Amino acid sequence: MATELTVQSERAFQKQPHIFTNPKAKANKKTKRWYKDVGLGFKTPKAAIEGSYIDKKCPFAGTVSIRGKILTGTVVSTKMHRTIIIRRDYLHYVPKYNRYEKRHKNVAAHVSPAFRVEEGDVVTVGQCRPISKTVRFNVLKVSAGASRSKKFSKF
């Protein structure tokens, strides 16, 4: 995932829609920041409260609400900007052979700059309104991935 170097990296001026940025304000005052609690037992990360990033698609500091399904999966790809691909494994029953077969689905999810996500991490995502053509989920919690010894590796 690309790291956020500066807040003002886009062509348009980036600001939170709920906060008035007064150019005449004293420089020593702490800047105001708007954030919210998404509910459902998920804590707002410290980076969302104290950070300086601007992300309108963030569930904690943006305008997106979480409703619907809550899913868990393993991060497979972090190559896109602020978007990850998670893999959800499941078993499908085949009645003819009276056995189960392994299957998986890939789900694209928006990841807020409040989280540092790497491949192999286990993330919990919540459903939100469609953010783009394929993205309908938002990362709510990041858990550390499985240790290297437990994972499959060639050597």
From Swiss-Prot:
One of the protein's GO biological processes: translation
Keywords of the record: Cytoplasm, Ribonucleoprotein, Ribosomal protein
Ranges in coiled-coil conformation: none
Compartments, as annotated in UniProt: Cytoplasm
Pfam families, per database record: Ribosomal_S17, Ribosomal_S17_N
Cellular component aspect of the GO annotation: cytosolic small ribosomal subunit
Keyword Mitochondrion: no
GO molecular function, one term: structural constituent of ribosome
InterPro entries recorded: NA-bd_OB-fold, Ribosomal_uS17, Ribosomal_uS17_arc/euk, Ribosomal_uS17_CS, Ribosomal_uS17_N
Broad class of the protein's primary localization: cytoplasm
Assembly: Component of the small ribosomal subunit. Mature ribosomes consist of a small (40S) and a large (60S) subunit. The 40S subunit contains about 32 different proteins and 1 molecule of RNA (18S). The 60S subunit contains 45 different proteins and 3 molecules of RNA (25S, 5.8S and 5S).
Similarity section: Belongs to the universal ribosomal protein uS17 family.
Protein's job: Component of the ribosome, a large ribonucleoprotein complex responsible for the synthesis of proteins in the cell. The small ribosomal subunit (SSU) binds messenger RNAs (mRNAs) and translates the encoded message by selecting cognate aminoacyl-transfer RNA (tRNA) molecules. The large subunit (LSU) contains the ribosomal catalytic site termed the peptidyl transferase center (PTC), which catalyzes the formation of peptide bonds, thereby polymerizing the amino acids delivered by tRNAs into a polypeptide chain.
Name the record gives this protein: Small ribosomal subunit protein uS17
